[in-house]
Each structure stands twice: as structure tokens, then as C-alpha cells.
Amino acid sequence: MALFLHKEQTIKIYLYDQKKIMKLFASTILISLMAFSTHAQVTIIGVTLPATIKAGDSNLSLNGGGIRKKVFFKLYVGGLYLSEKSSDAAAIVNADKPMAVKLQITSGMISSENMSEAILEGFEASTGGKTEPLKAKIAAFVNTFKKDEIVEGNVFDIVYVPGKGVESYKNGKLQGTIEGMDFKKALFGIWLGSKPADDDLKTAMLGK
């Protein structure tokens, strides 16, 4: 039909089509960038949390990360990894799905002894003081932090694999495995429960 249009009309139609193409192209690029940023690594006070990690055969993506602080000290950087994004803390804690928490020590104030004490306090808060049914499992988990001294730069991966349990890694080396959903819920509740170790870290882990 362009044969029957004036030259100016043909040019206007051409320019209109070009604008539509450019808008479509720009939208595609924006969507791609948003998808990339959702699964991008994050650097916090010099610590880089990778975009993805493995939990058994599952690939997990970084849901959010932040800093565990106490008074003026930045104790560690923590990241939460899930199979799909979520900001629902209770749903995450109760889910029988692959997930993980990565911790990198950023302070010389952390030692094996006070890390173990902090974990015990975390379980007390997470369970509302009802730790007796999990006593043996908690003790076994805490012992994995006592095998060697903890120093700044150490990395801990706490990985839940359904049907297998919670695997605890220090600097990539498996320290132990604790079975049971009851234990998994109490453990992840340390960071995501109603009385978390750090409110700001919880919010950051949830990607808020």
C-alpha cells in the first residue's frame, strides 16, 4: 500500500515502525537485565556472595544477604540461598526444600567458643526455649564448630538437602550431617524466626 501513499506518509510510517522496534528492543534488554540482577552475585563489605551454590543435585540462587552485627562489630556476612525467591520467612523455615545459609567471618572477635555459644543462644530463641527434644542434634551441630579454631575469613555453608539432612561445611570441607526436619526448622529459625539473631540481617536475607 506504500505505493499509493505520498512520500512524506511513507517516511512517517517507516519512522513509526522503527520506534516500535526500538521500544521492543529496549524492553527486551530491560527484562534481561532484571533477570540477570535477580541471580547476580553481591559484594558486602568486601565479601562476595556467589549468585548460585549447590545443595545436593539442586541449584540454589542467592535470595538476599547482609551483615550480622553486634554493637559496633560486623561479625559475619550471611547469605540465604533458595530454589526460588521468597520473602516469607515462616514459609522458608517450614519448607522441606533445598536451601542454604552461607556465612563468612569478618571479625577477629569471633572464636570457636563464642560462635558455639551464639549458636546455642540462637537455638534457644528459635525454639522458644524448647531445645530439649533437639538436645543431641544441637550438640552434634555445635561440635562441628569446635573442631578447629575459627578465624576471620572462614566460610561456613549450612546446607539443607531434603531426605538427607543439614550438611555443615567449613571452607568447603564437610564437617557433619544432622538429620530431621525438626532440626532444620530450628536451625534456619536462628536467622529467620520471630526472634532472629539480627533483625536487619533477616530482612536482608529475605531480599527486602
Question: Could you describe each region identified by the protein language model?
Answer:
Residues L3-I21:
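Short, Lys/Arg-enriched N-terminal segments with co-localized hydrophobic residues
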Residues T10, M34-A35, G65, G180:
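Ubiquitous "structural anchor" signal
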Residues I21, F36-A40:
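Sec/Tat signal peptide C-region and signal peptidase I cleavage site
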Residues S27-A35:
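Bacterial N-terminal signal peptides
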Residues A40-K208:
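Terminal leader/tail segments of proteins
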